[in-house]
């Protein structure tokens, strides 16, 4: 499916085929970077689709197109074969139309992969849940900035969990306000390192007979991906 090149973008405008149209309103963007995966899932072209999520590349287009988008916990799904963007936060996840379908997909794609040393053999084994559950509701995620419908749905489900006998407590994560700043320190540094091999300057294939730096980048990539 169409996506922003190297997962860099939030609209699929930085792609080989131009921006993907939103599944509900073609005048709007589908989101990104995995916008194409969200759209084909929303339009029932496929029962599910995969994507990568570093800083919202599954969750944002899923939200824009009204489907379920899951970024699994780091180490749950192998990243083998994925062109790394920022290795500390890159995760493979899925798009589906229901939460139940997302569970089925995650059961298939999760697990140990000897080609990815960050994966665990059975992610769910050490986290067997005892009933009743104790669930934290993050206060910083329930501010006035949250869409009222999303906030209402979350609080409604929290009450449903309480009625089922589970404990739901408000939990404060004061450092949450700093996460975006930390993201923009860590991710650009890792992107610079991971993608250095593709510019044809220091590592990898280097095109010849070039006149400008932009031409060096373009020809090196063209020759390397043929």
How does the language model describe each region?
Residues 1-107:
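Short glycine/serine-rich loop segments
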């Amino acid at each position: 499916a169409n996506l922003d090149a190297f997962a860099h973008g939030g609209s699929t405008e930085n792609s080989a085929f131009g921006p993907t149209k939103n599944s509900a309103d073609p005048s709007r963007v589908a989101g990104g970077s995995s916008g194409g995966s969200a759209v084909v899932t929303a339009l029932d072209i496929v029962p599910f689709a995969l994507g990568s999520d570093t800083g919202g590349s599954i969750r944002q287009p899923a939200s824009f197109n009204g489907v379920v988008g899951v970024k699994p916990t780091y180490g749950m799904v192998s990243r083998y074969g994925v062109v790394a963007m920022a290795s500390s936060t890159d995760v493979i996840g899925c798009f589906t139309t229901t939460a139940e379908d997302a569970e089925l997909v995650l059961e298939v794609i999760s697990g140990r992969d000897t080609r990815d040393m960050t994966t665990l053999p059975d992610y769910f084994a050490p986290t067997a849940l005892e009933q009743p559950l104790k669930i934290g509701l993050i206060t910083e995620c329930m501010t006035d900035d949250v869409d009222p419908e999303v906030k209402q749905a979350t609080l409604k489900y929290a009450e449903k969990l309480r009625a089922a006998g589970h404990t739901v407590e408000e939990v404060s994560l004061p450092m949450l306000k700093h996460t975006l700043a930390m993201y923009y320190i860590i991710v650009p540094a890792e992107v610079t390192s991971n993608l250095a091999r593709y510019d044809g300057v220091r590592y990898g294939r280097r095109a010849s007979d070039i006149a400008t730096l932009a031409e060096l980048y373009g020809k090196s990539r063209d020759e390397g991906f043929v």
